[in-house]
Amino acid sequence: MLTDLTFIHAADLHLDSPFYGISHLPEPIFARIKESTFASVRHMIDAAVREHVDFILLAGDLFDEANRSLKAQLFLKKQFERLRECGISVYVIFGNHDHLGGEWTPIEWPENVHIFSSAVPEEKSFFKEGRRIASIYGFSYQARALMENQAARYRRSTDAPFHIGMLHGTLSGSEGHDPYCPFTHDDLVKSGMDYWALGHIHKRQVLSAEHPAVIYPGNTQARHIKETGDKGYYLVHVTNGDISYEFQRAHDVLWEKAAVDVTEAKNMTALFQMVEDTFSKLRKKGSPVCVRLVLQGTAPEWLLEAPKGTLDEFLEALQEQEAEEERFVWPLRLDDETENEANLTNLDPFFGGLFEDIDRSDLSDVLEGLERHPVYRRHADRFSQEEVKEIKEQAQIILKRQLKVLDT
């Protein structure tokens, strides 16, 4: 008979993320962003204590680098000690970012922390009231690149009433991510697990709500503008063998993309008010926000005729007013994606051909060269088809903006 279980499933904490490219921000804002990966973990641990969960599953990439810092390790140790005081266990696997082949100063983890250090799946039991209630299976990466299917090796090995597989990897055929530790849905089903606690993909996804439940919780804190929306973990309840789960927010800083339609903006004052209204909505989300602002719609004549650099000045003005806000809405970028009413079809056919060339162009060679760079691979994912499409659209917008001069 299964005793009820409550646990947290999280992954991809990425403690010590460097947040490259934004160190020029005002010091208080950059400090808040840089510490956000740590703060999100604190939020999650607070919830674990509040909810009296039985255990926490951390499915890889707790640290952003294999050469993990002492600061990040000691921080995590302190959080785990808080859990120990409440009788909460922790089960950990390490992934491609924090693989066991790195170099660091080792520390001793509290006795409530159970680390799967093996290169192949192994079992660890969770006991409650003297009975084995759950068997948890997992392994850790020994080096960064693991291209073999390990999911097929998972099998039940005890008579526990509930079985959990922890795996840091990629569903075969998925795009936009390095295909580390690829697996198929059949691999997961054949294992006999009741719940699969996945990690590696930073966008939360429920791959299967049926038995077995297969879930990516996403990362606990976004680190760049490609990771928009709420970030956190799943709170899972097992009652009489039935599994229910709900997403819980943990992020400390929210990253968003916000579109502003400028078609009806009569002047710069009106545009400023539109952006202010957008900021007010974002501010109600309850945490500081980093936002990519996108101007869309038909560009009014006054904006087309504005001096060069006007939008750059506008962005600087918006940033200045947020520099001292504790719950800031910081505009990282201002992208002009507006359309010009001018009819570009009357231009030389050469220009029409340029637009067609952009649509047809294959960027794989260019992007693959970037994706192979070791620094890029440490801190970013592969480009998805959606992102490649966005690159092409941005190129067309820039071309249209330059051609407007020829059509006046």
Swiss-Prot record:
Which residues make up the binding site for a divalent metal cation 1?
Answer: 35, 61
The cofactor note reads:
Binds 2 divalent metal cations.
Q: Which cofactor does it need?
A: a divalent metal cation
Q: What superkingdom does the record give? A: Bacteria
Task: Identify a single GO molecular function assigned to this protein.
Answer: metal ion binding
Task: Describe how expression is induced or repressed.
Answer: By mitomycin C and UV irradiation which requires RecA; probably a member of the yhaONM operon.
Segments crossing the lipid bilayer? none
Q: Does the keyword RNA-binding apply?
A: no
Q: GO annotations under biological process? A: DNA repair
Q: Which InterPro entries match?
A: Calcineurin-like_PHP_ApaH, DNA_Repair-Maintenance_Comp, Metallo-depent_PP-like, Mre11_N, Pesterase_YhaO
Keywords associated with the record: Hydrolase, Metal-binding
A Pfam family for this UniProt protein? Metallophos
Residues annotated to bind a divalent metal cation 2: 61, 96
Family membership: Belongs to the metallophosphoesterase superfamily.
Full protein name: Uncharacterized metallophosphoesterase YhaO
